[in-house]
Regions:
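Hydrophobic structural segments
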Residues: 1-112
Length: 112
């Protein structure tokens, strides 16, 4: 079986107050296109936790203190050839120093 990866799914957690800015930014770069539809994303409310160490400059919270943040997990598909451009824009607008980003390769149904 020869599988040609043409799309990826980008998943990132974002503070709830910033999710629309991130969504608009990645979709304006070309993420979230499915057939004849654009801005196709999914978001799920969640609680993120982290402890910034002494070297961190946290957007939310204090160094060396456990933080609980209302976040949304934002998901969007993206053509693999524009993924780097989308990720660059995501990092530019995301408020965190080190956002948690997953990049999942997608298999086309016809390749199964």
């Amino acid at each position: 079986m020869n599988i040609d990866i043409k799309k990826v799914k980008i998943i990132v957690t974002v503070p709830a107050e910033n999710v629309e800015e991130v969504r608009n930014s990645i979709c304006n770069e070309g993420a979230g296109v499915i057939g004849n539809y654009t801005y196709c994303t999914m978001s799920t409310k969640c609680i993120g936790t982290f402890i910034p160490d002494d070297k961190a400059n946290p957007y939310i919270g204090e160094n060396n203190k456990l933080e609980f943040v209302e976040e949304e997990k934002l998901e969007a598909v993206c053509d693999i050839y524009i993924a780097k451009k989308v990720l660059k824009k995501l990092r530019e607008v995301h408020p965190y120093e080190e956002p948690a980003i997953d990049i999942i390769p997608l298999i086309n149904e016809e390749d199964l």
